[in-house]
Amino acid sequence: MESFENLSIRDSFTSGMEHVDEELGGLSDLSISKQGPTLSPQLINRFMPHFPSSPSPLRNTLDFSAAKADEEEDDRMEIDEVDDTSFEEEYNNEPIETHTEATENAVVEEIEATPEERQKQEKNESQDQSVEEVENIVSPHRSTVIKALLSPTDLGVAAATKVEGVVPLPPSANQDDNESSNNNAEGEDIIRNEEVEDEIKSSLGNHKSSQYANAFDSEIIKRELRSRSKYQPIQVSFNTHNYFYSDKDGIKTYSLTKPNHNKIDEFYDQNEAFKLPKPWSPNSHPASRASYALMSYLQLFLNAITTVVIFSFILSFIIALQKDLKSTWEQRKHELQYESRICQEQYLTNRCNQTPGLPALGEQCAIWKQCMDRNNDIFFRARSTLSAKLFGDIINSFIDPLNWKTLFVIFCGVITWCFSSNFLLGFVRAKSYYGNGIKTYPLPSSPKSPTSEETHSSMTASGEDSHLLKQ
């Protein structure tokens, strides 16, 4: 007990404890924002691949390699302010607090003060509607259009008609499942759009919502995203699709063309979307049978007349060329025979056939004898050079009086006549065949229950009425 009484708090036994006090003092001076040894981004990315030096452009502040000495960040966590309006109040059409109404009224005042923005919004809406109408029409691929351009009749039919309907895809086992999933997704989108539209009507009134509904697209999207973030996270994903094709043998071929999911080209080729039936065909059911038959036979007659005229002109040119070649060959043959007779006369006149001939005419007599004894048929058989020369002379004699400009005008006139006549007659035939200018392909009927048909029709009707939140 006496030893315990001699003890005190300020005991002199401090051997081995000085470094503990220093460590405790150093720990008390630590903070989250205290600078440590800076590391290079290569080491950080190598040893901590799950936590890169610059994770994303939205988090560039987390730069561990370039921290400044004079920056000291606060340790407190930033908490977003929570909106007072709950999810139930927004979707149960209950009155919302006054601060949201004040902001919306301020937006209305700004829109009323800027009429130019209204015109821009109306133009954008009209453009969106036109784009949607064009997307609803089944359009062919470039190759099909190029094939149609080569035929003026098909081009006229394409200009006079538009093909509507959905391309019938090959039957698959998962077709019913895909239809049910698509109907469910469309139903959810339609219900969500209707709820947001009712919310606008309840907050602004029917007359204001009908007038400024299109101007509140951004506000509606913000409120929708804000309400959605309360019960589910909002994610943005970028998908890159790599399409790989394989032929019938299973060999992979990598093509740069876009995949034809709807098989539009095959559909157009099989159904002959730009072809009109013959008027005498049993499959021909025109809207106006008399006008369709008249235009069809008129086109056939004009094409026959044009073909006969063109081929008769070409045939007459070929016949005239053959006659000219034959006459030229005969003339050349007569010239060779005449030269041989002249050589024979000179040879006999100068007595080259006698044994004591004249010494001064020895060389000339040899030339006359060679010319007299030659075979003219052998020289006449080599007619390729003569034919080419004659053909060039005929072309020059044909072009020189007419000139190149005249020939070009004649050629362009013939091409214009053939193209324009077939294009116009194809256009008129399509109008007389289809009447309204719309060609439809009905889909093969699939067995469906009446309840599913009713729900699908109600969803489509409500989808046409609701035009909000086009994402």
Swiss-Prot record:
Pfam families: Brr6_like_C_C (PF10104). GO terms for cellular component: endoplasmic reticulum; membrane; nuclear envelope; nuclear membrane. The keyword RNA-binding does not apply. Residues 172-185 have a biased composition (Polar residues). One of its GO terms (biological process) is lipid homeostasis. Interacts with BRR6. This is Nucleus export protein BRL1. It comes from Saccharomyces cerevisiae (strain ATCC 204508 / S288c).
